[in-house]
Amino acid sequence: MKHRRIAILGGTFNPVHHGHLIMAEQALWQFDLDQVLWMPAGDPPHKPLAPGASKADRLAMVKLAIADHERFACSELEIRRSGRSYTIETLRTLIQEQPNTQWYWIIGVDALRDLPQWYQAEELARLCHWIVAPRVDAGDAAQVLQAVAAKLPIQAQILEAPTLTLSSTYLRQQIQKGGSIRYLVPPAVEHYIRQHRLYLQP
């Protein structure tokens, strides 16, 4: 039986933007994936959530952003989990539910640098292949990967994709000061943000 190839793209998506979509699309083709599974975080242990949108809002925005892509899907696994969202627990659940799958995890180079400090990092590193997404402001991806590989048994490749400075932090700041986010997020996401008056307060 041919194993399906699925990459998980986790994040707070607070809000989701075109940088996330470009990353997912490039990973899909570079690694010949069957699917990219978007995984909005519930209560991430490594990154405190900025205020402005509820779990339900962040989930809804991801679903709107990927609605027209037949090989993108959204999981509610972490959003619906009570307590902290640990990556290793998510992976164990997915592996159990879909055993005939080669799992990948798309990770930004900034998060990769901290991977050795993640919960049960050594076992986590072994559970899947890692796709490292470069970032303009996060250092050389190859050097970071080399440093992490010296500490963890990791199989990883670097994603060949445009490096954008666009971030959810920037978008929240734009909204708070009344600026435009047109062309930075999908139109449906912008409409949702405006309709629900998200991110207006700092």
Curated annotation (Swiss-Prot):
Organism: Synechococcus sp. (strain JA-2-3B'a(2-13))
Protein's UniProt name: Probable nicotinate-nucleotide adenylyltransferase
Key word NAD present: yes
Function summary: Catalyzes the reversible adenylation of nicotinate mononucleotide (NaMN) to nicotinic acid adenine dinucleotide (NaAD).
InterPro entries the record matches: Cyt_trans-like, NadD/NMNAT, Rossmann-like_a/b/a_fold
Catalysed conversion reaction: nicotinate beta-D-ribonucleotide + ATP + H(+) = deamido-NAD(+) + diphosphate
GO terms (BP aspect): NAD biosynthetic process
Pfam family name, one: CTP_transf_like
GO molecular function: ATP binding; nicotinate-nucleotide adenylyltransferase activity
Similarity-based family: Belongs to the NadD family.
Pathway: Cofactor biosynthesis; NAD(+) biosynthesis; deamido-NAD(+) from nicotinate D-ribonucleotide: step 1/1
Gene3D superfamilies with a match to the protein in the record: HUPs (3.40.50.620)
EC number: 2.7.7.18
Protein keywords: ATP-binding, NAD, Nucleotide-binding, Nucleotidyltransferase, Pyridine nucleotide biosynthesis, Transferase
